Amino acid sequence: MINRRYALLLVALGALLLVSCVVSLGFGPARVPVDVVWRILLHKIFGFGVPDWAAGQEHIVWLIRVPRMLLGALVGAGLALIGAVLQAVTRNPLADPHLLGVTSGATLGAVIVVLHVGEIVGLLTLPIAAFIGALLSMLIVLMIANRNGRLDSDRLLLCGVAVSFVMMAIANLLLFLGDHRASSAVMFWMLGGLGLARWELLAVPAASVLLGLVLLLGMARPLNALMAGEQTAVTLGLNARTVRLRVFLIASLMTGVLVSISGSIGFVGLMVPHIARRLVGAEHRRLLPVCVLLGSLFLVWVDVAARTLIAPEDLPIGVATAAIGGLFFIGLMRGR
């Protein structure tokens, strides 16, 4: 009975996500009717139908909104997945993908390249620079946190916060001293957004989220044990430090990939796992797929709000998620 209910929940969430993805494509400064969106998708994917819509509508839907929607779904899924496993290995309900210092490293890399190097490889310049910065930040955090060959999760989180503050201070100083026209572009990226979405940029985040999901599902049993406490994990014959290190590495690499394209989008990794646990409990083989679907669903609709609330301007999506996340946790605390 429980397995049937879980399967029905996955089917319902999957169907809701699919419908949401299609419907969301109609929203924006230029509204496109849902029936036109549907016909454009059928024509571009399967070759069905004869194009009887405006060329501008096809350009907006297929080249701008579909990549943006897919990137939003991938980023939402990835951040929710990372948040769930970090909360498990740290046993901290407030653990978040950005606590590892990866986001600040990505920000610093982006600031340095945009202000002092320029677009040496076109549109890919900012994502590549951000990913390199994220990797360097991750390595610095791991080097500082590693003491006598041992990696403690509390020490790692503290090092992540410390490195994050230092790197953000350097990035803000460079922005203050740099060209203000270039700084404005970096500032919008720092606030989080999906404006960099292009078809050619989707393969890497898609691969990282899919591979991360497969690897973390394979670690569901150790994650369950760590949630129950380190003594339980040791009793079951697990090496808790090794499990934590693997999770931190996977989470850091995934965060680096996602943040390099979308900028800093907060609260998804904090909020979605709490909602998912209320639906299916804390068993990670059941929890992680639900987190992926809920994270995608959440960010797809937040992006709709971001591009319609102050149209024709784009509201930075990180601002929207922060506002929603703050209200969510106020409600959560009042309910306890």
Model-assigned labels for residue ranges:
Residues 1-336:
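Alpha-helical transmembrane segments in inner-membrane proteins
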